[in-house]
Regions:
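Glycine-rich ThDP/TPP pyrophosphate-binding loop and its adjacent helix/strand module
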Residues: 47-48, 104, 110-292, 481-522
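A short, small-residue-rich loop immediately preceding and capping a beta-strand
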Residues: 20, 56-57, 109-111, 141-159, ...
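A short glycine/serine-rich beta->alpha loop
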Residues: 2, 16-25, 53-61, 104-116, ...
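A glycine-rich helix N-cap at a beta->alpha junction
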Residues: 81-88, 173-179, 446-459
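Non-catalytic terminal/interface segments that mediate subunit docking, oligomerization
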Residues: 312-436, 442-450
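A short, hydrophobic C-terminal helix/tail in secreted or cell-surface proteins
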Residues: 523-527
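Cofactor-binding active-site loop characterized by glycine-rich and histidine/acidic residues
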Residues: 30-172, 385-386, 414, 418
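Flexible glycine/proline-rich, aromatic-decorated loop/lid segments
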Residues: 196-202, 258, 390-392, 441-458, ...
Length: 527
């Protein structure tokens, strides 16, 4: 049965890519057994309640393989992904764009495509789960108890952002993060031996990860056993799965020719014969749907129903936390923040806006227990520290100060993952000139409609003693050019409060706060 279902995934991908005359069939054909194992053996999802906050998360970091995800969602009963939608793959207005888009297609947990960011966002999801579990879980009430899974390819591990984020995840011991490495030795330009020869598992062991190895990427039982071993490790896990790109396409498998182009009619016919798939394009045997109904849909629905009953009992046993949880489940902040919560700013009050920002964010932190964030090793310069808290780590999971280290890009992507998870308000800080390092993540914040707040300080030539490398010049224009990003450059303490209020009440727009170290005075004209 499993072989039939895996081939169904493969040929949904092949046929949709052929029809659109565009796409990446190789990863779909090679990674289909991994996707099948995750959805039918491991993950708890409910297509009837796709935004269930305690669902297992799945991030296809190798977003060019989007038809793998769309095929899995279709077979798992997600209504957005009908056969007709699969036939519209990569077409204008469809639910099946070339790369997965969060908020556009139900069942997609993250917008991916820029390689490596999917891994980093998954790190954020795992950290969000850990924080929320630490705050809300009680004995007998595992309200937040799920895993975050990733399928990533060689290209993802070449990108620096995955290295930054993975180093951080190992430090944090995020043991509910499991990354499956689609290790096929091929990239778009040829073989990875020409550009990428390091021992990835050894690198991840140095990060503090558990690693597993599956020699045969078609062996579902071995893949499943590796996942079970990963779950017992107490660490984030990397599972290297050796696959053949384009598995089953006899003349193209194992080559870069199957990476980024349709198989075409002749090779598709040969693959059908080679894999014993005797079905017309987009024709799926009823046994495949039955397999997914029993092992994905019904299993997920049962898990969801059990969880709903648990939440109802929890609200009775812990009414105060239950009230916060109820708001989170409605898509709201645990506690509502109002502009009147800020203290009044007196006329004539002089303060640098970075200091005004610290005052404001501490007022917010005192009111909203699910507001947290940090800085890329500049907390005391960016003034991003929550004064009532210590640093968050594996032994202090409830603390709300996050020390991201000098990892600006990963910080932004991790914040995106935390926001994608739901239930949290998050922020991160660095020098304004280093917004260049984080801008790719800021762009994904905007594309995904995530209300992440970026605190950029030292916006002034007054940092001139550091030299031109640290003087932001073109950066404001660059941020303002990003659609769906609110950029605030407040002039004094009052405007800084107003900017923070807009940031923490935003529903679907990220915010960039551009702040200085110079004194600014509030006067009556500001009122």
């Amino acid at each position: 049965m499993s072989n039939l279902s895996v081939n169904a995934i493969r040929f949904l991908g092949v046929d949709a890519i052929n029809q659109s005359n565009s796409g990446h069939p190789g990863v779909v054909m090679g990674a289909a057994p991994m996707g099948y194992t995750l959805f039918t053996r491991q993950m708890h999802v409910n297509p009837e309640v796709p935004n269930w906050i305690n669902r297992d998360r799945f991030v296809l970091s190798a977003g060019h393989g989007s038809m793998l995800l769309y095929a899995l969602l279709h077979l798992s009963g997600f209504k957005d992904l009908s056969i007709e939608e699969l036939k519209q793959f990569r077409q204008w207005g469809s639910k099946t764009p070339g790369h997965p888009e969060f908020g556009h297609t139900v069942g997609v947990d993250a917008t991916s495509g820029p390689l490596g960011q999917g891994i980093a966002m998954a790190v954020g999801m795992a950290q969000a789960e850990r924080f929320l579990a630490s705050r809300y879980n009680k004995e007998g009430f595992p309200i937040f108890d799920h895993y975050t899974y990733v399928i990533a390819g060689d290209g993802c591990f070449m990108e620096g952002v995955s290295a930054e984020a993975s180093s951080y995840a190992g430090l944090q011991k995020l043991d509910k993060l499991i990354v499956l490495y689609d290790s096929n030795d091929i990239n778009l330009d040829g073989e990875t031996k020409d550009s990428f020869t390091e021992d990835v598992r050894a690198r991840y062991e140095a990060y503090g990860w558990n690693t597993e190895f599956v020699q045969d990427g078609t062996d579902i039982e071995a893949i499943n056993a590796a996942i079970e071993s990963a779950k017992a490790s107490g660490k984030p896990s990397l599972i290297e799965v050796k696959t053949i790109i384009g598995h089953g396409a006899p003349n193209k498998q194992g080559t870069n020719g199957v990476h980024g182009a349709p198989l075409g009619p002749d090779e598709t016919a040969a693959a059908r014969e080679n894999l014993g798939w005797n079905h017309a394009p987009f024709e799926i045997p009823k046994e495949v749907y039955a397999d997914f109904k029993e092992n994905t849909v019904d299993r997920g629905r049962q898990a969801y129903d059990t969880w709903v009953a648990l939440v109802d009992e929890y609200k009775q046993s812990y009414p105060e936390l239950g009230s916060e949880l109820a708001r989170i489940l409605e898509g709201k902040d645990a506690v509502e923040f109002q502009s009147s919560d800020f203290p009044a700013v007196e006329n004539g009050y002089s303060q640098a806006t970075r200091n005004s920002s610290q005052d404001a964010l501490n007022v917010i932190a005192d009111k909203v227990p699910t507001f947290l964030g940090g800085s890329a090793d500049l907390a005391h310069s960016n003034m991003t520290y929550i004064k009532s808290e210590g640093l968050q780590d594996d032994e202090h999971r409830l603390n709300r100060n996050i020390q991201f280290g000098v990892r600006e890009f990963a910080m932004g992507a991790i914040l995106n993952g935390m926001s994608l998870h739901g239930g949290l308000r998050v922020y991160g800080g660095t020098f304004f000139v280093f917004s260049d390092y984080v801008k790719a993540a800021v762009r994904l914040s905007a594309l995904q409609g995530l209300p992440v707040t970026y605190v950029f300080t030292h916006d002034s030539i007054a940092v001139g003693e550091d030299g031109p490398t640290h003087e932001p010049i073109e950066h404001l224009a660059g941020l303002r050019a990003i659609p769906n990003l609110n950029v605030y450059r407040p002039a004094d303490a009052r405007e800084t409060q107003a900017a923070w209020y807009q940031a923490v009440t935003s529903k679907s727009t990220p915010t960039a706060l551009v702040l200085t170290c110079l004194l600014y005075t509030s006067d009556a004209a500001d009122e």
